[in-house]
Amino acid sequence: MSANKKCRVLVVGAGPGGYVAAIRAAQLGMDTIIVEADKTGGTCLIRGCIPSKAIIHAAERFENLRKHSAEDGHMGISITGDTNIDMAAIVDWKDSIVNRLNKGVESLLKAAGAELIKGWATFTSSKQCIVETEEGSVTIDADNIIIATGSSHIDLPFMPCDEEFIISSTGALDLQKLPKKVAVIGGGYIGLELGCALSRLGAEVTIIEGMDSVLAIMDKEIRRPVEIWLKKHKVVVHTQAMAKGAVV
C-alpha cells in the first residue's frame, strides 16, 4: 500500500534536534511531518543518558544493599540472606522508563500538530523522499527539509561488535545476564559510566585507555575523585594501552 503526502516542513530524524524542530514548526502553523525509523527521543532518551542513568541508579541501590548484608552490617543495619541480581529484570525496568518518556515525546508531537511517520526515508530529489514503513511506502513532497539523523557508533575494524561477546554501549544497556568479567575499551565518560555500574553490580572490570589517564580531556580536579573510586572498587585501569584484538 502506497500513499502520497505534501508538507511545508519535513524533518528526518526524531532525536532532540529533530523533534524539537518539528514541534516548533507545527506550533508556528506549518504543515509538518517527522520521520523516524526507531523510537522518538534520540540517543539520549533511547540508548544514552537516560537508560544509562537508570542502570547506574539500580547498581547504586544494589551496592548499598550489599553494605547492609556484610557480616557486621552498615550503620548498624543488617540484612540477612543473599542479595541477588536479576539483570533481565533491571533491563525491563530501564526499558519501562524509556518507553514512558518515548510516549511523552510522541504526545508532544501530536499536541503540536506534527505528523509522525515511522520508517526509513530515502531521498529521490532535493524536495522529495520515499519512506518505507510497515504498512508500505509513503512518498513525501516537502517545501523545506530538516535532516536530523544523528549518528551511530563506530566499530573498531579489528574488533567489530557482535553484541554477544564484543558489545557496544547500546548492547551493554541490554545485557540479560551480568558477565563475570568485562574489559572496557576507552576510559572516557561513557566507558566509565558503564564500567562503574557493572562493577557495582558485581562484575570484575578492567578499563583499557590509550591516553595517559582516564577522562584525559577533563581537568585533573575532575579526574581525581574518579581515579580514587576506581582504585577503591578494585577496577583495574591500564593507561597508555591500545587494544589490538580479541579472542572469543
Regions found by a protein language model. Give the residues of each.
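Glycine-rich flavin
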Residues: 2-7, 23-30, 35-178, 211-215, ...
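N-terminal Rossmann-like FAD-binding beta1-loop-alpha1 element of flavoenzymes
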Residues: 8-34, 191-199
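Conserved hydrophobic packing residues within short motifs/helices of P-loop NTPase cores
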Residues: 10-12, 33, 147, 183, ...
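Rossmann-like NAD(P)H-binding beta-loop-alpha module
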Residues: 176-218
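Beta1/beta-strand and adjacent pyrophosphate-binding region of the FAD-binding site
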Residues: 3-15, 178-188
